[in-house]
């Protein structure tokens, strides 16, 4: 009897694979195939037959020897083992005993045997099957040099074509290399990216149309660019160039009620639209506002190069202008604009995420999404409202799309660092200051306030001299009752240090190293402090309780509040706004009005009281313009939709100079904060900005 296992037989193979499959392989039909496998052919050459080998360690067939497995030890002689094996492993359906696939190798004088590895048996069977199936799959077509393919027509065939040789010859392409075919086959097994955004229209903007608009008034003008579709704008960040048209769908909200006609014009690249009926000389169509179905236009891509760069704005424009109003009474409707890419739209030339392109990017992130992140660029508190003005101005910390400023401060709030050289004279409260060397503009500290005092005062000791009747704890009653010597200055907390404080003579002065200072831009001389609207290193003054001896102090200041002058917001009077040379300004244009962003500044002396402060930009807008690389034509606006919690909304447009505009002469006082901002694209500055708000005659404070 065997002491370990029996020899590998067909019965073992049935267990490893499947009994039915192996039964089919051993002489029976397998599906539609007829394959017979002789197991002796898997390992032994034909001339060896089924004889046993008596010298396995000097095998004449090295490949056969490599398939030999573990040595098995038996007590009984080979003949007895063979008979026992046949008796214990059953028979096939035809009565034939299950014999071993390969007779064991024997070593003369012992009863040690070597059996074939099971994996080698399975591999041999699969190899035979592969060869057999390959012969069946081989093409039997005649592929000589005269062989051609011919195409079939999609429509009814011509009666003249009676043989296949008369069809249209389809040119054969060179067959891809096997490695390329393998790559394509692997890639095709993955799930392709869905492109449903190519088929549906996405909201872009809304347009207000009033019957008071004159004929030829441009309501909408849009140059072809990926930024007018939210999905194209998102994907464009991965590419350097684009090409193709965009479909635009207009839906008039007053359809069936609101009368009048509009003209849709296609303006070629290089031509700027004007508000005149002469624009109808360009290709155009007219559509009636009373029609209930949306109107779809396609902005075609007219170009002289293969692709457009992402900043290119000299492209085909779609212009919507008033052709004819249908009523004498004032009525208004809203036109919803939606976009989708045309079938020929495509991107090209991938670029790494985050890489900068020299021509500039789309100005889509100048205003933070949530108003909780809106700080002013004049004062560091949160924006709480807007003020629409016919004229807006600011120099310091105001940046344009060229990343330039006419001011002296960086777009960050940092402590003001100055040096004060005190000379004791008759006045020991007003002092000139010297800026540190790391200032943006030499001689002027970074962050120095940009307003001056309202009027000339004596350079003497002062206090909060608010006479009775000036303020009633809520608001200013009579501005004339303000006799404070340092009104109009900014109140700063300080950290002051004195050189060599360990000296005995400086001990008393070192006790004053941290005291409140009042700073301003003014002209100090002849015991007088005069207003100065042009800043320079000689016009920087501070008011504080100075030392009683000559010494030099270094001070780090942090603005905390403002010494109240009157009931006017800080920065609302251009005569008190400080500049280096010129003062950047913005005026009403194209029915759009410039705005200040309003926040609150603490007032000195009055407990928990604040006053309004006007800012020309949101601080993050200043930061992005100073550090970024944005592309915006001089006659265009980067448009953001501002929406409050009650679904009121209005558009803010930022022009190339960095100033902001709205399309209303007043904004409602009941906007519910926080607000949200959404980038809507770029439009002409002459086109009125859209809105949907309850208009009042009061600006937000």
From Swiss-Prot:
It comes from Vesicular exanthema of swine virus serotype A48 (isolate Swine/United States/A48/1948) (VESV). Transmembrane segments: none annotated. The keyword NAD does not apply. The record marks 152-153 as: Cleavage. Keywords: Capsid protein, Host cytoplasm, T=3 icosahedral capsid protein, Virion. Homodimer. Homomultimer. Interacts with the minor capsid protein VP2. May bind to VP3 and Vpg proteins. One of its GO terms (cellular component) is T=3 icosahedral viral capsid. The keyword Endoplasmic reticulum does not apply. Gene3D superfamilies: 2.60.120.20. Capsid protein self assembles to form an icosahedral capsid with a T=3 symmetry, about 38 nm in diameter, and consisting of 180 capsid proteins. A smaller form of capsid with a diameter of 23 nm might be capsid proteins assembled as icosahedron with T=1 symmetry. The capsid encapsulates the genomic RNA and is decorated with VP2 proteins. Belongs to the caliciviridae capsid protein family. Pfam families: Calici_coat. This is Capsid protein VP1.
């Amino acid at each position: 009897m065997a002491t370990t296992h029996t020899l590998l037989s067909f019965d073992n193979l049935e267990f490893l694979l499947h009994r039915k499959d192996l039964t089919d392989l051993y002489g029976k039909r397998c599906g539609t195939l007829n394959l017979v496998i002789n197991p002796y052919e898997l390992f032994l050459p034909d001339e060896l037959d089924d004889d046993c080998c008596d010298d396995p360690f000097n095998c004449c067939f090295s490949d056969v020897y490599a398939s030999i497995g573990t040595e098995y030890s038996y007590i009984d002689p080979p003949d007895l083992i063979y008979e026992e094996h046949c008796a214990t492993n059953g028979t096939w359906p035809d009565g034939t005993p299950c014999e071993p696939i390969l007779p064991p190798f024997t070593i003369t004088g012992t009863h040690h045997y070597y059996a074939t590895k099971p994996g080698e048996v399975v591999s041999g069977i699969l190899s035979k099957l592969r060869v057999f199936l390959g012969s069946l799959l081989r093409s039997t077509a005649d592929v000589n040099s005269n062989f051609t393919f011919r195409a079939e027509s999609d429509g009814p065939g011509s009666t003249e074509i009676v043989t296949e040789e008369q069809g249209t010859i389809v040119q054969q392409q060179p067959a891809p290399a096997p490695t390329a075919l393998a790559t394509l086959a692997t890639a095709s097994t993955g799930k392709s990216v869905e492109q449903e955004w190519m088929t549906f229209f996405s909201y872009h903007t809304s347009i207000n149309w009033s019957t008071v608009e004159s004929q030829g008034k441009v309501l909408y003008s849009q140059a072809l660019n990926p930024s007018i579709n939210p999905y194209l704008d998102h994907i464009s960040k991965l590419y350097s160039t684009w090409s193709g048209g965009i479909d635009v769908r207009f839906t008039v909200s007053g359809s069936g009620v609101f009368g009048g006609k509009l003209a849709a014009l296609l303006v070629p690249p290089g031509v700027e639209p004007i508000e005149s009926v002469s624009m109808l000389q360009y290709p155009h169509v007219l559509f009636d506002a009373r029609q209930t179905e949306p109107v779809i236009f396609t902005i075609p891509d007219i170009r002289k190069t293969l692709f457009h760069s992402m900043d290119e704005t000299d492209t085909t424009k779609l212009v919507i202008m008033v052709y004819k109003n249908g009523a004498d009474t004032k009525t208004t409707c809203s036109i919803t604009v939606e976009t989708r890419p045309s079938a020929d739209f495509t991107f090209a030339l991938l670029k790494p995420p985050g890489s900068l392109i020299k021509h500039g990017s789309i100005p889509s992130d100048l205003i933070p999404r949530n108003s909780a992140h809106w700080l002013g660029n004049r004062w560091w508190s949160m924006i709480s409202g807007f003020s629409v003005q016919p004229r807006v101005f600011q120099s310091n910390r105001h940046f344009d799309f060229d990343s330039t400023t006419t001011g002296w401060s960086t777009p960050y709030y940092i402590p003001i660092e100055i040096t004060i050289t005190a000379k004791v004279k008759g006045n020991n409260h007003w002092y000139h200051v010297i800026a540190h060397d790391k200032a943006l503009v030499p001689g002027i500290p970074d962050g120095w306030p940009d307003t001056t005092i309202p009027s000339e005062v004596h350079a003497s000791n002062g206090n909060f001299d608010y006479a009775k009747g000036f303020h009633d704890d809520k608001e200013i009653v009579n501005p004339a009752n303000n006799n404070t010597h340092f009104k109009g200055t900014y109140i700063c907390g300080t950290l002051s240090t004195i050189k060599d404080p360990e000296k005995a003579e400086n001990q008393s002065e070192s006790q004053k190293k941290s005291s409140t200072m009042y700073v301003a831009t003014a002209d100090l001389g002849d015991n007088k402090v005069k207003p100065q609207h042009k800043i320079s290193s000689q016009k920087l003054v501070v008011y504080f309780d100075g030392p009683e001896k000559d010494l030099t102090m270094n001070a780090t200041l942090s603005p905390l509040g403002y010494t109240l002058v009157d009931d006017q917001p800080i920065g609302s009077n251009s005569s008190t706004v400080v500049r280096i040379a010129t003062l950047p300004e913005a005026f009403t244009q194209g029915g759009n009005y410039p705005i200040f962003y309003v926040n609150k500044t603490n007032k000195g002396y009055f407990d928990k009281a604040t006053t309004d402060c006007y800012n020309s930009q949101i601080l993050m807008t200043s930061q992005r313009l100073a550090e970024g690389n944005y592309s915006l034509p001089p006659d265009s606006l980067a448009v953001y939709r501002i929406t409050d919690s009650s679904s009121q909304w209005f558009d803010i447009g930022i022009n190339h100079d960095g100033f902001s505009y709205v399309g209303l002469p007043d904004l409602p006082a009941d906007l519910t904060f926080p607000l949200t901002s959404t980038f809507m694209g770029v439009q002409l500055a002459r086109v009125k900005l859209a809105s949907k708000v309850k208009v009042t005659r009061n600006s937000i404070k």
